[in-house]
Amino acid sequence: MKTGALTTFLALCLPVTVFATTLRLSNEVDLLVLDGKKVSSSLLRGAESIELENGPHQLVFRVEKTIRLSGNEERLYISPPLVISFDTQLISQVNFQLPRLENEREASHFNAAPRLALLDGDAMPIPVKLDILAITSTAKVVDYEIETERYNKSAKRASLPQFATMMADDSTLLSDVSELDTVPPQSQTLTEQRLKYWFRLADPQTRHHFLQWAEKQPPS
C-alpha cells in the first residue's frame, strides 16, 4: 500500500462510536492479546493508552522488568504469559498495579503465584480473574492468539468463551457493523483489517505519531 493511500485509509478509521473506558498502558507490561486479537505492537509502541468499549475484556500479557542480582548485576525479568479478565461496564479508566518485583526471590514468587491488580480512575480495585497462560505449542515463535483461543475454550479460571472463536476465521475479522463504518470489501486484506482495528483503539496521540511515521515511508 502506498504511503498516501495508507494515510488516507487510516484517517478514515477514526471511530464513529464513543468508547467509554481508557486502558492505561504500563511500560512494564507487554500486551500480547486483547479480547482474542493479537496486539499490533508496531502501532501501540509508545502508546500511553487504548480506548475500550464498556463490557467484558480479556488481556494476555507479560510483565517485563529489570531486577537486581547478587553483586550489583541486573537482568531483564520476563514473566510467563498471564491472562486477566475483567468488566468495564461502569468503569471509565483501568490502570495496572504491579507488585514489588526487584530481585530473583520476588520474581520467583511471582512466577509461582502471580498477583496484580487493576485499578479504576479512583484507585479502587476492579474485580479480576487472573491465570497463567500455559503454552502448548513447541514452535520457536508462539502464536499467542491461537493459545488464547485454546485457553478460552477450556473453561479455565480467566476464560471468556465469547472471545474463543473470534479469530477462527480471518474473513470475519471486524465484519461486525459496530466495529466498522462499512463491511470491508473482499479485496481488503487481513493486514489492513487488523491495522484498522488497532488504529481505532489507539489514543489520539498514538494515531498522530503513526500517521507521521506513515507519511515518511517510501511507496511500496
Curated annotation (Swiss-Prot):
User: Domain of life here?
Assistant: Bacteria
State the UniProt keywords alphabetically: Signal
NCBIfam families in the record, alphabetically? CrliSynInhib (NF047712), PRK03641.1 (NF002967)
Name of the molecule in the record: UPF0319 protein YccT
Q: Which InterPro entries match?
A: UPF0319
For this protein, the parts annotated as crossing the membrane are none
Family per similarity comment:
Belongs to the UPF0319 family.
Which Pfam families does the entry link to?
Answer: DUF2057
Keyword hit for Iron-sulfur: no
What range does the record give for the signal peptide?
A: 1-20
